Amino acid sequence: MDNKIIIGVDHGNRFIKSSEGIYSSGYVESSTVPVITENLLYYNGKYYSIGGKRVKYHYDKTIDETFFILTLPALAMRLNKEGITSADVILGVGLPLSHFQLKQKFINYFKRENIHFTYNHKKYQVNITEVMCFPQAISGYMLYFEKYRELDYLNLLDFGQVTLDAVKIH
């Protein structure tokens, strides 16, 4: 594809967050067009009203299509901002350190070709050509690494809506 974009998506248990917006980590699935079509995703023959009540907590978010489906609106928002409807995507995602053994599984889950979907009445086509997976919260620490370099250890806390991840860095 001629268009290439890089986007980071935070797959929180309460909210999906990207540079283009934030929305609840939930949806209502339907086989027919719902009455309210705001934040409506059409993918693989089904309609998804994005937002509302969050989905149940998943330790492994790759067990079903839920978090892939919840990623598509973020991609659409970014493409829309760029004024394009198709692109090769480099997707950045994060995992808590306590879940980081799932890194390769997460990468394989998101890396897909020829993805067609409609979001808010606009058709999109993307190839997720590369997925980069990072440990959550570490990037914030790395911004100030020199400031804390002399410490023997540092407790790093990542507060989510329904989770708390704590890491001791030596």
Question: Which residues fall in each region the model found?
Answer:
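Nucleotide/phosphate-binding catalytic cleft detector across ATP-hydrolyzing
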Residues: M1-L156
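Glycine-rich phosphate-binding loop of actin/hexokinase-like ATP-binding domains
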Residues: D152-H170
